[in-house]
Each structure stands twice: as structure tokens, then as C-alpha cells.
Amino acid sequence: MKVIVINSTPINPIVIGRIKGAYGILGWVKILSFTEKIEDIFVYNPWFIFFRSKWKVIKLEYWRLMNNKNYIVKFFNVSDRNHAMALSQHNLVVESIQFPKLYNKDEYYWKDIIGCKIMTINGKCLGRVISIIDTKAHDILVVRSEEYGFTKYVDCLIPFILKKIIKDVDLIKNIVVVDWEIYKF
């Protein structure tokens, strides 16, 4: 398989989507966009994938919307289904420097929240944010704690509702303060 390679490695890679699988026999792939508006995935360029233990730049040749929610794309030099299948389940990555600057103090990129320590207003550490779930109502922080003895870790879901539950976000110290209690059963 020949993927266009530029001697470049993303310094601060951010996942903006995922290659879901092959589409048809001519090298097209289905992609899942993680951007807020699904079409915004095409604003960012170049795309990188971590393929066969190396970062590679992949270039779009064509793209189109399928059934109003998913895109199919054709990459340069990916010409058949076998090549497309080899790319399946790879994350689509861009440099974080491409993201626009946030001017509202209550706006955050997920990349900045993931990894933050979660502290209660009483000073108890609940764990670290390992991922975020996007729902129509609000985002949900997935917080992993290793405090509990009978299992290796416990995940806790905390709604990201500013002022009501999320009391403070300090990206310098990597700490999110929450008004939330964990109850052991």
C-alpha cells in the first residue's frame, strides 16, 4: 500500500475522527467525525494516521456525505478495497495548533480536560478524566479512580455542567473542582 508520506510527525496530535471501514471496491473509506459539526473535520489539514508504527500524512482526494450523518472519503494512492481495509479502525489526527483559540472563559477543548485530576469541593480526589461522552444534553466526564480495593479501578460519570456541578477548571494545574460525591455500595 502506498500512502503519501511527508517527513512530519504531529507534535501535539489530536484525534478528530476515525476510519470506520472500507466502502465499495475502489478504495473509499467510511469515516466518523468527532468534531462538533461533523463537516468541520474537513477544515483541518493535513490528516495524520499512525500506520504500521509510523506517523503518515494522508491526503484527501474526494469526499461526500452519506445518509446525512457519515462521510465517505477517497485518499490519494488508496485505490482498492484491500488498501482501504488496511486503514480501518485508525484514528484521524491533526495538530492541535490548528484549533481556533477559545475566548470564552467557560469554553474548553476536550483535549485540555482529559487527564485533569478531579477534586471535590471538600478536597477529595476522585480520579482523573480518561474520556468524555458527548450527549445532546451535556458532556459527561468519565473519571477513573484506583482507590477501591476489590477492583483495579472504578469509573465514575460526572456531568459537565458549569457552575452547578463543575465549580472550577484550572488548566494550569490540571484540576477540575466538582460538587459531586461518590457513594460506596
From Swiss-Prot:
The keyword ATP-binding does not apply. GO terms for biological process: ribosomal small subunit biogenesis; rRNA processing. SUPFAM superfamilies: PRC-barrel domain (SSF50346), Translation proteins (SSF50447). Its main location: cytoplasm. Gene3D superfamilies: PRC-barrel domain (2.30.30.240), RimM (2.40.30.60). The keyword Transferase does not apply. Keywords: Chaperone, Cytoplasm, Ribosome biogenesis, rRNA processing. GO terms for cellular component: cytoplasm; ribosome. It comes from the Bacteria. GO terms for molecular function: ribosome binding. InterPro entries: PRC-brl_dom, PRC_barrel-like_sf, RimM, RimM_N, RimM_N_sf, Transl_B-barrel_sf. Residues 105-184 form the PRC barrel domain. It is found in: Cytoplasm. It holds the Pfam family PRC. An accessory protein needed during the final step in the assembly of 30S ribosomal subunit, possibly for assembly of the head region. Essential for efficient processing of 16S rRNA. May be needed both before and after RbfA during the maturation of 16S rRNA. It has affinity for free ribosomal 30S subunits but not for 70S ribosomes. The PRC barrel domain binds ribosomal protein uS19. Binds ribosomal protein uS19. Belongs to the RimM family. HAMAP family: Ribosome_mat_RimM. This is Ribosome maturation factor RimM. It comes from Blochmanniella floridana. The lineage of its organism: Bacteria, Pseudomonadati, Pseudomonadota, Gammaproteobacteria, Enterobacterales. The gene is rimM.
